[in-house]
Amino acid sequence: MSILLSPPSLLLLLAALVAPATSTTNYRPDWNRLRGLARGRVETCGGUQLNRLKEVKAFVTEDIQLYHNLVMKHLPGADPELVLLSRNYQELERIPLSQMTRDEINALVQELGFYRKSAPEAQVPPEYLWAPAKPPEEASEHDDL
C-alpha cells in the first residue's frame, strides 16, 4: 500500500518532521527547577568562537551590561552559555546560546525576570533590586514560637 501526498501536504509533513530537530533556540524555562533564581552569568570565550557568532557577540558586548544581576565571565575555549544561579551561587541550569539570535537571548533573559536598564549606569528601581529573584519574605512575627 502506498500513500500519495500532494506537494503542499508533502511540504507540511517535511516541515513538521524537520522543525523539532532545528528548534534548539526554543528554550522553555522549567520554573520548578529554577526556584530561587537570583542571578545569571554568561560564560564564553573572548575570541575566535565568539567572533564566529555575530548575534551572540552583539549580546555579550552590548547588552549584558544593561541587565541587573547578569555578569560576563570569559573562559578560554568555552561555548557561550547562560548559567542561572541561586542567591548562594548554586548552579540551577545552563542554557546554550550558540544557536540563538540576539533578540532571542534578550527575550529569554527578560522572560527569566532580569531587569533591563535604559543605560549601563542607570539606577535600578527598588522593586527590581532583587530581580530576577523575589525579595526575601518579611520575617514573621511568630518566628520565635
UniProtKB/Swiss-Prot annotation:
Q: Where is this region: Disordered?
A: 125-145
* Localisation per UniProt entry: Cytoplasm, Perinuclear region; Endoplasmic reticulum; Golgi apparatus
User: So which domain of life are we looking at?
Assistant: Eukaryota
Just give the chief location class. cytoplasm
Q: Where is this cross-link: Cysteinyl-selenocysteine (Cys-Sec)?
A: C45-U48
Q: Which UniProt keywords apply?
A: Cytoplasm, Endoplasmic reticulum, Golgi apparatus, Selenocysteine, Signal
Q: Which GO terms describe its cellular component?
A: endoplasmic reticulum; Golgi apparatus; perinuclear region of cytoplasm
Gene Ontology biological process terms, A to Z: adipose tissue development; corticosterone secretion; hormone metabolic process; multicellular organism growth; response to selenium ion
Active site (catalytic residues): C45 (nucleophile), U48 (nucleophile)
Q: In which tissues is it expressed?
A: Widely expressed. Highly expressed in brain.
Q: Which residues form the signal peptide?
A: 1-23
UniProt keyword Ubl conjugation present: no
Q: What does this protein do?
A: May function as a thiol-disulfide oxidoreductase that participates in disulfide bond formation.
Protein family (similarity comment): Belongs to the selenoprotein M/F family.
Name the chain's protein.
Selenoprotein M
- Origin species, per record, is Mus musculus (Mouse)
